[in-house]
Amino acid sequence: MKKTIMASSLAVALGVTGYAASTGHEAHAAEMNVDQAHLVDLAHNHQDQLNAAPIKDGAYDIHFVKDGFQYNFTSNGTTWSWSYEAANGQTAGFSNVAGADYTTSYNQGSNVQSVSYNAQSSNSNVEAVSAPTYHNYSTSTTSSSVRLSNGNTAGATGSSAAQIMAQRTGVSASTWAAIIARESNGQVNAYNPSGASGLFQTMPGWGPTNTVDQQINAAVKAYKAQGLSAWGF
């Protein structure tokens, strides 16, 4: 899935790679004597700092590849954005700052997700898709939802998928909802650079995951072959 970011103040300058045109020149990190290791650390571990302030004063357009990821940092001097994506083009994380309101839409046919921002406020919005964290967890359940101790949930789509999985496998819907919450936080388009994707984070060998139905089918195949051990149970 390729993601694009569009902000009202960057609509002309920002394209599918997330670059903003500031001086007409896209500067590689080496050209600006940028500490790539520091920027990589910020993108993965300190996203709040990237959202709070630009990495330097004035306009800039920095992009570089490191350890299998493409990193982009742009600013027009007023608003700024940053992103990083796996080498295969799957966006791992991005943010466009100085936008208070945003809407998201997903085109299932073209596998493109767009985020439109209203850049009239200093508030920031962040959307990120990252590899799932595996740990011991506890769940609280209602008739239609599961919430893990870390706050992850299966979401509306994930809860529906869990019900279908229960019908097709005989395993309780709450168990499947917990798996979905842990693996993807209910994000249909969740992607792990390892290749796992979808609500259930199944590997490509179990089948395509472009749609929720395909994700359910892939999860059923994985379950029939490996049982719940496919998800570490």
UniProtKB/Swiss-Prot annotation:
Hydrolase keyword on record: yes
Domain of life: Bacteria
Keywords of this entry: Glycosidase, Hydrolase, Secreted, Signal
Compartments in which it is found: Secreted
Cellular component per GO, a single term: extracellular region
Principal cellular location given in the protein's record: secreted
Residues making up the signal peptide according to the UniProt record: 1-29
Protein family membership: Belongs to the transglycosylase family. IsaA subfamily.
Protein name: Probable transglycosylase IsaA
